[in-house]
């Protein structure tokens, strides 16, 4: 009984200390991904338009650049302008985890960390992309992340509404989504 109470207290602590993270009871949902996904069309620069806040992203002017590697995987280079004015960047590698579902990628930024899901739920390749990531912990709860990306620093409101409708129709909570400030950003990619 004491062990269970300690576990529940630890779990409650996780929920309260992970400011901005989107924790939910139960396993991750499994929304449909972009049909006939073409990774080559997806390559290039994307600007972060909106997101569910993530502890590993604290800045503004967030951009990602995807390029094809010699081994067939995708190099991921994320950059942001931190609150103190310095530019932070992290480089990772993404790969398609299942050939029959090419829009389901896995991305890894650090060798000792397990890869994280990176699912492209929707994209037209030229204007917008909707990315979803979710990890289940202990079969009891999950944490998810959402990114709305654009080829330009801003997307029309109707496009953002369309993408958010995809999320809500698949049971993904958008309440905590925030807009990423892309104003007065340096061109650092």
Curated annotation (Swiss-Prot):
Q: What is its main location?
A: secreted
Q: Where does the record place it?
A: Secreted
Recall the GO molecular function terms of this protein's record: cholesterol binding
- Describe what happens upon changing residue 146 to F: In strain: Swiss Webster
Q: Which residues are glycosylated?
A: 65, 98
UniProt key word Nucleotide-binding: no
From the record, give the cysteines joined by S-S bonds: 28-134, 61-185
Provide a GO CC annotation, any one. perinuclear region of cytoplasm
**Where on the tree of life does the source sit, at the highest rank?**
Eukaryota
Keyword annotations:
Disulfide bond, Glycoprotein, Lipid-binding, Pyrrolidone carboxylic acid, Secreted, Signal, Transport
List, in alphabetical order, the GO biological process terms annotated in this UniProt record: brain development; glucose metabolic process; lipid metabolic process; lipid transport; negative regulation of cytokine production involved in inflammatory response; negative regulation of focal adhesion assembly; negative regulation of lipoprotein lipid oxidation; negative regulation of monocyte chemotactic protein-1 production
Stored SUPFAM superfamilies: Lipocalins (SSF50814)
Positions of post-translational Pyrrolidone carboxylic acid modification:
21
Q: Span of the secretion signal? A: 1-20
Tissue-level expression reads: Highest levels of expression in brain, testis, virgin mammary gland and salivary gland. Moderate levels in skeletal muscle, lactating mammary gland and thymus. Low levels in lung and lymph node. No expression in kidney, pancreas, liver or spleen.
Listed under subunit, the entry gives:
Homodimer.
Give the function comment from the record. Answer: APOD occurs in the macromolecular complex with lecithin-transport and binding of bilin. Appears to be able to transport a variety of ligands in a number of different contexts.
Family, as annotated: Belongs to the calycin superfamily. Lipocalin family.
**UniProt protein name:** Apolipoprotein D
User: Can you name the source organism?
Assistant: Mus musculus
Species classification: Eukaryota, Metazoa, Chordata, Craniata, Vertebrata
């Amino acid at each position: 009984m004491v062990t269970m109470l300690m576990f529940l207290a630890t779990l409650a602590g996780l929920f309260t200390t992970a400011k901005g993270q989107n924790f939910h009871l139960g396993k991750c949902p499994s929304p449909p991904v972009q049909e006939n996904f073409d990774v080559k069309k997806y390559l290039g620069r994307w600007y972060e338009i909106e997101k569910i806040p993530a502890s590993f992203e604290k800045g503004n002017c967030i951009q990602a650049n995807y390029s094809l590697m010699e081994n067939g995987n995708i190099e991921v280079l994320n950059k942001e302008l931190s609150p103190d004015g310095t530019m932070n960047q992290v480089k990772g590698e993404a790969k398609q985890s299942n050939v029959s579902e090419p829009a389901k990628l896995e991305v890894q930024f650090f060798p000792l960390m397990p890869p994280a899901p990176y699912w492209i739920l929707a994209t037209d390749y030229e204007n917008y992309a909707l990315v979803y990531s979710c990890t289940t912990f202990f079969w009891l709860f999950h944490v998810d992340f959402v990114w709305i990306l654009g080829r330009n620093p801003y997307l029309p409101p109707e496009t953002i509404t369309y993408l958010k409708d995809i999320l809500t129709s698949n049971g993904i909570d958008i309440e905590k989504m925030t807009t990423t400030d892309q104003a007065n950003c340096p061109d650092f990619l």
